[in-house]
């Protein structure tokens, strides 16, 4: 069961990654159309304003179609066969579901969803152009999960020859069409009550203050090894747990209003404390890396620096910290618990000093969605955040250095044997086993992803040992038939992996942002045999 939950959480990362770019586009557009920043050139009707208005509208695509993107994104990772067709089926059935909901509202309740949307009545929205109940991303995710189940079960269903035209995607849609009718009726009956519960939750989270921010941030970090952290931040950042439509959309919608106001950001947007978890990526990660470097053996410092610098760059710029965190998680889990506590304390401290915003990503998000737009009227808050962050960088360094030395933790560069540092070089592994001898049959002439995939495929026990293969943002998630056939972690690290999570036959290989390409190469090798 846990394996399925982890897969589901990881699948949500496919659409989430799109927000990194579009958020910057909308943030920049907001800055460049702000007359307080740009002057008269940014007044409505000017060529400059019109240009950035067009760019902004394109950037808004992902935010306005978020439920559809989440619905289409899930089958990419969850469908066990013909993922592209599963995405098409999901889009068709999710749209059908929304039409059913709108029709039921009109026929049985006398409610014109189109009029409700036009009048901006809370609880209604146009999803993909269909006026319906606003089920937010939850509706898209639940329907997508149901369609994926139907797809995996019925796509290969063999029909009599005279009904052959209805096989495959058509049959899945036929079954789904029937299933969507009771789903729509249940939604109309249950969802309004659920919306009332969400409204109550929003009020509770708003009143929870500093303690709520601490708990939220702590859980978001501490659950990373399990993959369940997606279920912590998604309802807040992309769902309605804190504000309607989620913090991500709400912040972007009001960014110009907040930037032009002279009131404190915390009074304008108190719920913004639930999106401060990115600060540990910007300020905490460098402190951790410096502590590892400072405590490494003198003859290994150069190798440790070569290992950590690209990882820190990734963490700070893009907000992807798993490659760093998994360099010490399994050899020193106590450090990860301390990391979660410090991250939560940093976020709570910043919130106490009035820092709020949309800060779940990396430095690019901080600059373009927060610091640059807000600096003119909220410079004090921005400076306070940076000062507090740098103080915590020092705290991270001191605490991690103390614990590493006090407990003699074998972090990178402190291993008892020289051999261990070589685990991060796939070249050594290939030299030992021979170029292209991995079971995937990949030669040295092929690309780096293929080489990495070949080594990982061999470490997983070969294609015969793989039952399911998918990925999230940074991890390759694999279900194997026989865990005893897996090679030691050294084999995975030889391919450049940052760590391996083993839970019975459920395996997670932490690769980094190149994981989609690596997965694709492995799948190609498995098909070729």
UniProtKB/Swiss-Prot annotation:
InterPro entries attached to this UniProt entry: Glu_permease_IIB (IPR036878), PTrfase_EIIB_Cys (IPR018113), PTS_EIIC (IPR003352), PTS_EIIC_1 (IPR013013), PTS_Glucose_EIICBA (IPR050429), PTS_IIB_1 (IPR001996), PTS_IIBC_a_glc (IPR010975)
Keywords in alphabetical order: Cell membrane, Kinase, Membrane, Phosphotransferase system, Sugar transport, Transferase, Transmembrane, Transmembrane helix, Transport
Active-site residue numbers:
472
Record-annotated PTS EIIC type-1 domain positions: 1-416
Membrane topology, as annotated: Multi-pass membrane protein
Compartment list:
Cell membrane
- What EC designation does it have? 2.7.1.-
UniProt xrefs under Gene3D superfamilies: Glucose permease domain IIB (3.30.1360.60)
Where is the chain membrane-spanning?
Answer: 8-28, 59-79, 91-111, 130-150, 170-190, 198-218, 222-242, 272-292, 304-324, 328-348, 352-372, 380-400
Offer a single GO CC term for the protein: plasma membrane
PROSITE patterns for the chain: PTS_EIIB_TYPE_1, PTS_EIIB_TYPE_1_CYS, PTS_EIIC_TYPE_1
A GO BP term, please? phosphoenolpyruvate-dependent sugar phosphotransferase system
Query: A GO molecular function for this record?
Result: kinase activity
**Location (main, coarse):** membrane
Any idea where the PTS EIIB type-1 domain is?
450-529
> Record's domain comment?
The EIIC domain forms the PTS system translocation channel and contains the specific substrate-binding site. The EIIB domain is phosphorylated by phospho-EIIA on a cysteinyl or histidyl residue, depending on the transported sugar. Then, it transfers the phosphoryl group to the sugar substrate concomitantly with the sugar uptake processed by the EIIC domain.
In terms of PANTHER family, this protein maps to: CYTOCHROME C-TYPE SYNTHESIS PROTEIN AND PTS TRANSMEMBRANE COMPONENT, PHOSPHOTRANSFERASE IIC COMPONENT GLVC
| Its biological purpose | The phosphoenolpyruvate-dependent sugar phosphotransferase system (sugar PTS), a major carbohydrate active -transport system, catalyzes the phosphorylation of incoming sugar substrates concomitantly with their translocation across the cell membrane. This system is probably involved in transport of the alpha-glucosides trehalulose, turanose, maltulose and palatinose.
Q: What is this protein called?
A: PTS system alpha-glucoside-specific EIICB component
């Amino acid at each position: 069961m846990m394996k399925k939950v982890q897969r589901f959480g990881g699948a949500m990362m496919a659409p989430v990654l799109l927000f990194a770019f579009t958020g910057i586009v909308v943030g920049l557009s907001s800055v460049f159309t702000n007359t307080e920043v740009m002057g008269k050139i940014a007044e409505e009707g000017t060529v400059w304003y019109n240009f950035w208005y067009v760019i902004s509208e394109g950037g808004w695509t992902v935010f306005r179609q978020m439920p559809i993107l989440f619905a289409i994104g899930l089958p990419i990772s969850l469908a066990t066969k013909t993922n592209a067709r599963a995405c098409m089926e999901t889009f068709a059935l999710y749209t059908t579901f929304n039409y059913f909901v709108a029709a039921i509202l009109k026929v049985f309740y006398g409610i014109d969803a189109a009029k409700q949307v036009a009048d901006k009545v809370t609880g209604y929205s146009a999803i993909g152009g269909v006026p319906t109940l606003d089920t937010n991303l939850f509706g898209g995710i639940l329907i997508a999960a149901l369609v994926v189940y139907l797809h995996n079960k019925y796509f290969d269903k063999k029909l009599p020859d005279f009904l052959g035209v209805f096989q495959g995607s058509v049959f899945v849609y036929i079954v789904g069409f029937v299933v969507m009718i009771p789903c729509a009726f249940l939604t109309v009956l249950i969802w309004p009550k659920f919306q009332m519960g969400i409204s109550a939750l929003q009020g509770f989270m708003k009143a929870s203050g500093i303690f709520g921010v601490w708990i939220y941030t702590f859980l978001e970090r501490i659950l990373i090894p399990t993959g369940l952290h997606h279920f912590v931040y998604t309802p807040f950042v992309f769902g309605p747990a804190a504000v309607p439509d989620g913090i991500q959309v709400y912040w972007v919608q009001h960014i110009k209003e907040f930037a032009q106001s002279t009131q404190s950001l915390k009074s304008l947007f108190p719920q913004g404390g639930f999106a401060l978890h990115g600060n540990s990526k910007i300020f905490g990660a460098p402190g951790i890396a410096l502590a590892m470097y400072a405590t490494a053996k003198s003859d290994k410092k150069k190798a440790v620096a070569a290992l950590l610098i690209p990882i820190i760059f990734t963490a700070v710029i893009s907000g992807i910290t798993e490659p760093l965190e998994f360099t010490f998680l399994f050899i020193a889990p106590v450090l990860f618990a301390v990391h979660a506590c410090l991250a939560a304390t940093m976020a709570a401290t910043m919130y106490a000093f009035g820092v709020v915003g949309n800060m779940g990503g990396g430095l690019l998000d901080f600059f373009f969605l927060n610091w640059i737009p807000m600096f003119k009227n909220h410079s004090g808050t921005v400076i306070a955040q940076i000062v507090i962050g740098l103080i915590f960088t020092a705290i991270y360094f001191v605490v991690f250095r103390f614990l590493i030395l006090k407990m003699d933790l074998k972090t990178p560069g402190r291993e008892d044997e020289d051999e261990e540092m070589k685990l991060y070089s796939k070249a050594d592994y290939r030299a030992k086993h021979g170029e292209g001898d991995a079971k995937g049959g990949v030669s040295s002439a092929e690309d780096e992803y293929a080489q990495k995939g070949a080594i990982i495929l061999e470490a997983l026990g070969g294609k015969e040992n793989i039952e399911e293969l998918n990925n999230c943002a940074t991890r390759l998630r694999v279900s194997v038939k026989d865990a005893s056939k897996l090679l030691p972690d050294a084999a995975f690290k030889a391919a450049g992996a940052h760590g391996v999570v083993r839970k019975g036959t459920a395996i997670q290989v932490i690769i980094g942002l190149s994981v989609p390409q690596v997965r694709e190469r492995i799948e190609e090798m498995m098909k070729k045999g």
